[in-house]
Amino acid sequence: MAAAAGLLAAGGADAATTRAVADAAGVQAPTIYRLFGDKQGLLEAVAEQTLADYVDSKARRLPEADPVTDLRAGCDAHVAFGLANPAISALINAPQGRASRAAQAGVSVLRERVRRVAQTGRLRVSEERAVDLLHAMGTGTVLALLQKPAGERDGLAETAREAVFAAILDEQSPAVPSGMAGMASALRAGLDDLAVLTPGERHLLSELLHRIANASDR
């Protein structure tokens, strides 16, 4: 896999032929077929491992004291990873019908960062809506930037990020939730710590608050 990763980074998927990978790894081509099925299986395994390593580094990074600053840094890191690994980005963003385990883990990290923001009362939409918008922005931004020459990319990622932040956050009043959606999202984010309610009551209240947050967003 290390040999395939090196060829991918150097020349993209076209450079990582089965023969080239076998030569670089010092093995026979049948070994690759036995382990990964075919070239596509090998490339998908490389992409999964590369993404998993990146997600693991994100999960282990100490969060910023301010949740919004932390969320902004996470968005920037995602775009930077995508631009630094264009071949991997193309593989992990290809339509497959189901996200890989590493991709799901990445969304879980994003979900935790959004939860921290919601707990401060600065989220003006539901957590689910915020996660979906941020995920779409990150993926779309990377794919759009990869289609542009490096010299024409300035500012696009920041503009896209701030447009989504403006739609999901109220950064001017960190101590007071913004409207009904903000209050519902803030309360829902803290339900796990509300020991006075039974699990069933917390689940019901979570569903009601989710509906309020989404209705207020429309």
Feature-to-residue mapping (PLM):
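Amphipathic alpha-helical interface segments
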Residues: 3, 7, 81, 137-144
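Short hydrophobic clusters on alpha-helical segments that form packing/core surfaces
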Residues: 3-8, 16, 50, 54, ...
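Helix-turn-helix
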Residues: 7, 11-41, 45
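Short coil/turn segments at alpha/beta junctions that flank glycine-rich nucleotide-binding fingerprints
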Residues: 10-14, 85, 120
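Hydrophobic alpha-helical connector segments
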Residues: 45, 56-90, 94-99, 105-109, ...
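Amphipathic alpha-helical packing segments from all-alpha helical-bundle domains
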Residues: 96-146, 150-166
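C-terminal peripheral helix-coil segments that are non-catalytic and often amphipathic
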Residues: 112-115, 147-218
